[in-house]
Amino acid sequence: MGLPALEFSECCLDSPQFRERLRSHEAELEKTNKFIKELIKDGKSLIAALKNLSSAKRKFADSLNEFKFRCIGDAETDDEICIAKSLQEFATVLRNLEDERMRMIENASEVLITPLEKFRKEQIGAAKDAKKKYDKETEKYCGVLEKHLNLSSKKKESQLQEADSQVDLVRQHFYEVSLEYVFKVQEVQERKMFEFVEPLLAFLQGLFTFYHHGYELAKDFSDFKTELTISIQNTRNRFEGTRSEVESLMKKMKENPHEHKNISPYTMEGYLYVQEKRHFGTSWVKHYCTYQRESKRITMVPFDQKSGGKGGEDEAVILKSCTRRKTDSIEKRFCFDVEAVDRPGVITMQALSEEDRRLWMEAMDGREPVYNSNKDNQSEGTAQLDSIGFSIIKKCIHAVETRGINEQGLYRIVGVNSRVQKLLSILMDPKTATETETEICAEWEIKTITSALKTYLRMLPGPLMMYQFQRSFIKAAKLENQESRVSEIHSLVHRLPEKNRQMLHLLMNHLAKVADNHKQNLMTVANLGVVFGPTLLRPQEETVAAIMDIKFQNIVIEILIENHEKIFNTVPETPPSNSQLLLSRKKSTDSKPPSCSERPLTLFHTAQPNEKQESRNSIINSSLESVISSNANSFLNSNSAPQSNLNSSDLELEVIKPNRPNSLPQNPSPTSPLSPSWPMFSAPSSPMPTSSTSSDSSPISSPLRKARALYACKAEHDSELSFTAGTVFDNVHPSQEPGWLEGTLNGKTGLIPENYVEFL
């Protein structure tokens, strides 16, 4: 049923029937307004969905266009050519169709959304404003009328006439507003019949245009579609015809694979595992290797089927000799060593089986090993801190600083391994070692030169900053105060051997110059620390703890670079006197078990400035808390008489010679509390060994002996032993760590502090 008409004549009467008819028109306008809002929302969602659909179809078309068919064989048939180009044809059709869709989408917003928004805001919005005005005037008129009717008839005539005039004016204004509102309501009701429907028609017309364009594209594509269908059918028929022949050949290969092997240009080829040296120990990398006997050329391609690709650059070397690896010299089976003409050192390879090793050995004319106990030692340490070593580093540094210091990623980007090895073989050759820098390095890439420098440092028998100082360097980097870190590292650097310190000085000066150009080469001090930390401070064992300390290795290198002038050009400051250190320590009644790693092992003190001095700051800081315990206080009280007359010179540390690490003062004396062994007492009654007895004889003269622990010790590393006072160790002999012995306790072999034990 339609809406009733609103008569202007009824505006004056303002009857209930008129109000009811007006309310039905208002409800219809509100319904229309909500519908248009929902329609606009759905229209925007539709346009967004069409855009997403178009984007997805374009991406699909791009994927089709990028793929290229590669058929088996050197040439392609006409059918294969037709099939190969079909994806590009599909992509062209889809793109053409999406171009038309985008035109439709771009017009949809102007054709559909904008007109509907305009009609809703301008027309229906105007009707709502008119309604607010009409309701306001209605309330005003009714209020004035009620007030007027409540006037007393006893008022003056003039007042009554004035009130009548005012009511007439309000009534007239209300009547005008009512007429305007009725006119606007009926106008909007009529306008919606065309202004609302016309945009929808325009949108559908655009949609039909898009579909018609698709129809035209389909007609144009029909010829290629027919051709492609025929090509696909022909290809399927050929496949069915050749499949039986391929299956027959496969069965023959399964039954007798050796008769159907391809003729190879190589004397021998197959997979081998090649031992590679890393920052932490060694690793075995799978390579596909080939060998030609005529040219003696070995090619190694790192490849692992599990990872599905190459793991690095190819490498080719010229064979010099091949030797079977002695079984007891390596944990792996089926190993043999290869020496190359153009690469220093020995390449250790592992075959897949004993038969496979025999075939490789035969192909390379391999020989059995010579059982010489000194052979392994002679092959190690090809890189040394000698004149050639310094020459190599200086040449590399000169080349980098003169023509590559601004190259981005300097020292971080690595060179090709084969090129690096070839450059090193040239630099390490005594014949070319004396040549000038430019003659050696001018033709090589900067990344090859920087990789050669790092590789040479890793080839040294031990790290440049030495195994025995690694723990001290790491502890220094862990100090909270920056000045303490610099001071401690300063002292440790001057305890390095002269050649190590000179090489480190040379390297740090160079890295400081590299860091000064970090805006060009992007290698900040922090980046250089990441690169050189594992090289200069590589650990002796690959452990989780060593990996966790890498970040502190980097900090050590950063401090060396930032403070290289102070560290290498000045002598470390003299540590505070021992009497001052004793007075500055707070006494504690708690005594915790001493730790092997935190306790001083040997302490050197000399007046000659050119000799090395142990860093006493870190030693006393780490051990004095356990010194001033209740047990130690008892010991100090028993010697209070002689201590009362001491001056500062009386508190000098006693000299402990390196070949007598477990020696202690013969009798308790004023100097003994600061001797290296005094903090290790586990009880006041612990016996003090005398320096004149046979127990003081050097352990070096008797390699395997028994020893007894003088003090308790708690290990902080897997390589150390924990023990209590009085424990007896077997097979005690010197270790590679200065200040430590190796011994066996309860079947476990580990490190023991030298000055914790006496030999039996």
Swiss-Prot record:
Keywords: Cell junction, Cytoplasm, Cytoskeleton, Endosome, GTPase activation, Membrane, SH3 domain. The record marks 412 as: Arginine finger. GTPase-activating protein for RHOA and CDC42. May be involved in the regulation of neosynthesized protein export through a Rab-endososomal dependent export route. It comes from Gallus gallus. Residues 265-369 form the PH domain. Its main location: other. SUPFAM superfamilies: BAR/IMD domain-like, GTPase activation domain, GAP, PH domain-like, SH3-domain. The gene is ARHGAP26. This is Rho GTPase-activating protein 26. Binds to the C-terminus of PTK2/FAK1. It comes from the Eukaryota. The keyword Lyase does not apply. Residues 383-568 form the Rho-GAP domain. Residues 571-617, 658-701 are annotated as: Disordered. Residues 7-262 form the BAR domain. SMART domains: PH (SM00233), RhoGAP (SM00324), SH3 (SM00326). Detected in embryonic brain and liver, and at low levels in embryonic eye, heart, lung, intestine and skeletal muscle. One of its GO terms (molecular function) is phospholipid binding. It is found in: Cell junction, Focal adhesion; Cytoplasm, Cytoskeleton; Endosome membrane. InterPro entries: AH/BAR_dom_sf (IPR027267), BAR_dom (IPR004148), GRAF_BAR (IPR035483), GRAF_fam (IPR047234), GRAF_SH3 (IPR035481), PH-like_dom_sf (IPR011993), PH_domain (IPR001849), PH_GRAF (IPR047225).
